[in-house]
């Protein structure tokens, strides 16, 4: 066996055409090719799947059932595999407890740091908490005036389950007469009933004293006895006032604020020892959001200002509101913004104990009369959300609720005691709020004592290394407290990459899926250096990537194609980037050598004279931003990672437009106003989320073509004779579908120690329909055979059916002619799903008042696919007069835009400002813009290429 190569023979996963390929080991290998050409099939479904499967195979059958074994890939032979680690974009944790700090393990090191060198500081008095001497305890008690009655106790059981009989017997032997159990005082000889399954607190009453002169010695002896019995703790109850907790360990000598022994779990918000009890360590509480309940305060109650109580099916709540307003004298025809504070308080929060007469008449004419207090809209929504058994009701109520910072921990997720522990006057929550850059500066300037420095040195080394890795992959703007679920696919992937670098493993096969997604050109070099450093310590990297810089930095480049889907699945070219660039068969090579390129438009559109203006945007890191977007243009928002692009476009603009135009309830990010909405009629967000979550959804159903196809089959003579309607040709309802598999075409067989097996249905043989339905044919094919066609074949087949042909033509236009009409939506990539959505918009008639938003549409797209996508986007603007707004880093897209808005200058707190606006040429001239710096040479290069091409064409 050749130890220098990974040898693959006969790979046939998905669309791979029985290919053989050799991949050099310990090298940076990039796989590229058109979207859908088979890159992921080779990298993830063949190489990674086999590497993972071989590892799982080595485990016992018992262990295998917990791991979910992977299917054996369809391949004849793979040799030279190392243990494989896949870093893709789909495995991001959506757990609200996961943060950047926990995922990268930085938080674990911080917990250790605080447990070893942290100093508890009393939050009430600001003094450092140290262990107290008995003298300090006595002095604290004697501060109370004479004749104050006190009771000295030893807390021997604190919040523990059990009957504690043995403990009480031992107290008896010690000669003590009284004890306090859960706040009640008992004689030691009483029959004390203690429930076994509840938590209890037990204190021995040591002494009862009245403060006066000359009791110092007795007080000293009593406290000493309590400390001895309770392992260094004593409780002094000031009768009729409060209790003081004293500790030989850690407690404030003034107010008794006490911190237990410092240990790492105390600083974890995922542990009951550290988590804030109010929010359970989540940092937020779900509360009803008044602004979502009443989005438009200029409306009156009669005009439906209260959105959740607008009459839909039942009149119950509208009638209740009318009766309450009548009783409490609230005018239902006064706009909400003009109602008195008292009146609005009753409407929102209820009438407390005041009752009103309520007569409710239901739809069946029955009447109910009662006197009840008015619950209030906000408590009503919260109650219905928490108490309902209906998922529908809970989802409806959730629309009006939002996560607000927890009032107890202020969003830091931790207990008050934990947050009292400081290092350099900062608690662990404050350090987690730092960006990666700020954290590096903090640890570099940290001043500790000699002993503490010695203890913390190995911790600092690990923390600095991990922070450095995050900086090197372009994530220095993130904070460690950022929830993992809010990260983009590219950010999450680069975090996992940084974590892997931190592990310093060697001899591993890493498989990465487009790590450059969401990364500005400025940070791309750092990412490439990171990949090369992983290679240099002895790892093999296989990177599925379309970025030109990454391809040119590769040791070995594999181009898979030549086309997509059925037209792909072959190795077109393999070798160094220079060798691939010279290969005449390779489309990638043509783009690398400059034979093919995406041209710069001859002119930039000015728009239709109207514009959309965002005023005073302050969401996340935006610094009171004002931005204008000309309508009827192709505009692009650019800027380094973390500069505020998504905050401006997705958080503020998209949600505000959706709320106004689509009646969506999502609350937009903070902003003053958006002008010019009256010039739009609908907003369409075309993202990369799946077009359907079940295999029953497919491109034909999503674009609406399947409705027309079913109409066509129902209109055939045979179908009319049999009385079949269009519903007969649906695989989702009874009638025409195969009932053995319920229209799925496959049957799932559960295997306990092996992966579930899916077998074709024995009745319909995977065709999804019953025999009678399949008898109906149009132009020689039945409905199942039509669903098996590719879109290109379908277009030819339905060429004389304009309604169907128009819809299929748009799918071909976006470069998806290779997918099958009935291909399950779950098998489409993010880029493919996005283009199916675009196609379904293209065939709709437009009046030029649609606003399209796309967030990084080039994800997963080859330069050739990008060229096709740009033609479609330009068509939406050119033919329909619609507006397209794109968030993008790809310079091929940026150079084609009519108008750019560049945010920056940096990421995180260093961003959130508009650096430059205007045409790409204007941005390229800006000295402050990082985008302009990288755009300028591209514009110059491509203009030269265009001129050369024109000159060559003229000579011919």
From Swiss-Prot:
All copies of domain ABC transporter, residue ranges = 309-587, 607-936
Q: Where is the signal peptide?
A: none
Entry annotated with the keyword Translocase = no
- Key words, A-Z: ATP-binding, Cytoplasm, DNA damage, DNA excision, DNA repair, DNA-binding, Excision nuclease, Metal-binding, Nucleotide-binding, Repeat, SOS response, Zinc, Zinc-finger
Give one GO molecular function term.
ATP binding
> PROSITE patterns of this UniProt entry?
ABC_TRANSPORTER_1, ABC_TRANSPORTER_2
Subcellular location field: Cytoplasm
Cellular component per GO?
A: cytoplasm; excinuclease repair complex
Q: Which Pfam families match?
A: UvrA_DNA-bind, UvrA_inter
Any one GO biological process: nucleotide-excision repair
List the SUPFAM superfamilies hit by this protein, alphabetically. P-loop containing nucleoside triphosphate hydrolases
Q: Which residues bind ATP per the record?
A: 33-40, 639-646
Q: What is its main location?
A: cytoplasm
Q: Where are the zinc fingers (C4-type)?
A: 252-279, 738-764
Tell whether Ribosomal protein is among the UniProt keywords. no
Q: InterPro entries from the xrefs?
A: ABC_transporter-like_ATP-bd (IPR003439), ABC_transporter-like_CS (IPR017871), ATP_grasp_subdomain_1 (IPR013815), P-loop_NTPase (IPR027417), UvrA (IPR004602), UvrA_DNA-bd (IPR041552), UvrA_inter (IPR041102)
Q: Which PANTHER family match?
A: UVRABC SYSTEM PROTEIN A
HAMAP family this protein is in? UvrA
Q: Which family does it belong to?
A: Belongs to the ABC transporter superfamily. UvrA family.
Q: How does this protein assemble? A: Forms a heterotetramer with UvrB during the search for lesions.
Functional summary from the UniProt entry? The UvrABC repair system catalyzes the recognition and processing of DNA lesions. UvrA is an ATPase and a DNA-binding protein. A damage recognition complex composed of 2 UvrA and 2 UvrB subunits scans DNA for abnormalities. When the presence of a lesion has been verified by UvrB, the UvrA molecules dissociate.
Q: What is this protein called?
A: UvrABC system protein A
Organism (species):
Listeria innocua serovar 6a (strain ATCC BAA-680 / CLIP 11262)
Q: What is the lineage of its organism?
A: Bacteria, Bacillati, Bacillota, Bacilli, Bacillales
Q: What gene is it encoded by?
A: uvrA
């Amino acid at each position: 066996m050749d130890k220098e190569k990974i040898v693959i023979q006969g790979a046939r996963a998905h669309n791979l055409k029985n290919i053989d390929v050799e991949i050099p080991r310990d090298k940076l290998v990039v796989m590229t090719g058109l979207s859908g050409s088979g890159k992921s099939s080779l990298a993830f479904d063949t190489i990674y799947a086999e590497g993972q499967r071989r590892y799982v195979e080595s485990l016992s059958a018992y262990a295998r059932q917990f791991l979910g074994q992977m299917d054996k890939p369809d391949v004849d032979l793979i040799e030279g595999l190392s243990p494989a680690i896949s870093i893709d974009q789909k495995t991001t944790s959506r757990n609200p407890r996961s943060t950047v700090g926990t995922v990268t393990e930085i938080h674990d090191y911080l917990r250790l740091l605080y447990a070893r060198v942290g100093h508890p500081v009393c939050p009430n008095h600001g003094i450092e908490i140290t262990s107290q001497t008995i003298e300090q305890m006595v002095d604290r008690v004697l501060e109370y005036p004479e004749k104050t009655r006190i009771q000295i106790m030893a807390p021997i059981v604190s919040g523990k389950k059990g009957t504690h009989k043995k403990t009480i017997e031992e107290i008896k032997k010690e000669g003590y007469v009284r004890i306090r159990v859960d706040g009640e005082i008992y004689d030691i000889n009483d029959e004390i009933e203690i429930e076994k399954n509840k938590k209890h607190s037990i204190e021995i009453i040591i002494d009862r004293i009245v403060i006066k002169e000359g009791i110092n010695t007795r007080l000293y002896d009593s406290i000493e006895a309590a400390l001895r019995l309770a392992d260094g703790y004593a409780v002094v109850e000031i009768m009729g006032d409060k209790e003081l907790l004293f500790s030989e360990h850690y407690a404030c000598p003034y107010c008794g604020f006490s911190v237990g022994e410092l240990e790492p779990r105390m600083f974890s918000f995922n542990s009951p020892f550290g988590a804030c009890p109010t929010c359970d360590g989540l940092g937020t509480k779900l509360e009803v959001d008044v602004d979502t309940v009443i989005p438009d305060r200029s409306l009156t109650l009669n005009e439906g200002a209260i959105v959740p109580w607008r009459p839909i099916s039942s009149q119950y709540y509208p009638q209740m509101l009318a009766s309450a307003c009548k009783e409490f004298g609230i005018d239902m025809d006064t706009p909400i913004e003009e109602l008195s504070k008292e009146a609005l308080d009753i409407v929102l929060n209820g009438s407390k104990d005041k009752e009103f007469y309520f007569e409710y008449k239901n739809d069946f004419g029955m009447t109910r009369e009662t006197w009840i207090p008015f619950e209030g809209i906000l408590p009503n929504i919260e109650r219905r959300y928490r108490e309902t058994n209906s998922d529908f009701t809970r989802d409806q109520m959730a629309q009006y609720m939002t996560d607000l910072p927890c009032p107890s921990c202020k969003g830091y997720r931790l207990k008050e005691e934990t947050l009292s522990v400081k290092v350099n006057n900062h608690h662990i929550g404050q350090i987690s709020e730092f960006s990666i850059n700020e954290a590096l500066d903090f640890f570099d300037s940290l001043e500790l004592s000699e002993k503490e420095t010695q203890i913390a040195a190995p911790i600092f080394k690990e923390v600095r290394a991990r922070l450095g890795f995050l900086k090197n992959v372009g994530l220095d703007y993130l904070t460690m407290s950022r929830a993992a679920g809010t990260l983009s696919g590219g950010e999450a992937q680069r975090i996992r990459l940084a974590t892997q670098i931190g592990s310093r493993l060697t001899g591993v096969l890493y498989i990465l899926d487009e790590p450059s997604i969401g990364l500005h050109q400025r940070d791309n070099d750092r990412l490439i250096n990171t990949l090369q450093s992983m290679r240099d310590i002895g790892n093999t990297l296989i990177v599925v990537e379309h970025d030109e810089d990454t391809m040119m930095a590769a040791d070995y480049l594999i181009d898979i194609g030549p086309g997509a889907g059925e037209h792909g699945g072959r190795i077109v070219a393999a070798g160094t980037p220079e060798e691939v660039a010279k290969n005449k068969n390779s489309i990638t090579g043509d783009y690398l050598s400059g034979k093919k390129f995406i041209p710069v438009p001859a002119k930039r559109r000015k728009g239709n004279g109207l514009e959309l203006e965002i005023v005073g945007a302050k969401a996340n890191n935006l610094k009171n931003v004002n931005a204008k977007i000309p309508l009827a243009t192709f505009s692009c928002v650019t800027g380094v990672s973390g500069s505020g692009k998504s905050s401006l476009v997705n958080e503020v603009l998209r949600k505000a437009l959706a709320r106004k135009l689509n009646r969506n309830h999502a609350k937009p990010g903070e902003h003053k106003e958006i002008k010019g909405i009256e010039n739009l009629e609908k907003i369409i967000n075309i993202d990369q989320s799946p077009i359907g979550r079940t295999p029953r959804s497919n491109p034909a159903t999503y674009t609406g073509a399947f409705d027309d196809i079913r109409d066509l089959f129902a209109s055939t003579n045979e179908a009319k004779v049999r009385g079949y309607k269009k519903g007969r040709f649906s695989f989702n309802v009874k009638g025409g579908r195969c009932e053995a598999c319920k229209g799925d075409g496959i049957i799932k067989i559960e295997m306990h120690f092996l992966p579930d097996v899916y077998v074709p249905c024995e009745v319909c043989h995977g065709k999804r329909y019953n025999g009678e339905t399949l008898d109906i044919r149009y132009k020689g094919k039945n409905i199942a055979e039509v669903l098996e066609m590719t879109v290109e074949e379908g277009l030819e087949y339905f060429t004389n059916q304009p309604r169907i042909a128009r819809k299929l033509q748009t799918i071909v236009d976006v470069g998806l002619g290779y997918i099958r009409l009935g291909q399950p939506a779950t098998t489409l990539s993010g880029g493919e799903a996005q283009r199916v959505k675009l196609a379904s918009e293209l065939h709709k008639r437009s009046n030029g008042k649609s606003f399209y938003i796309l967030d990084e549409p080039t994800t997963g797209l080859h330069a050739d696919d990008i060229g096709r996508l740009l033609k479609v986007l330009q068509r939406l603007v050119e033919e329909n007069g619609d507006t397209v707004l794109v968030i993008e880093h790809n310079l091929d897209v940026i150079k084609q835009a009519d108008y750019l808005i560049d945010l920056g200058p940096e990421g995180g707190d260093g961003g959130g400002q508009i650096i430059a606006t205007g045409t790409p040429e204007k941005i390229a001239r800006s000295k402050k813009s990082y985008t302009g710096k990288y755009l300028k040479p591209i514009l110059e290069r491509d203009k030269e290429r265009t001129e050369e091409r024109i000159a060559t064409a003229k000579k011919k």
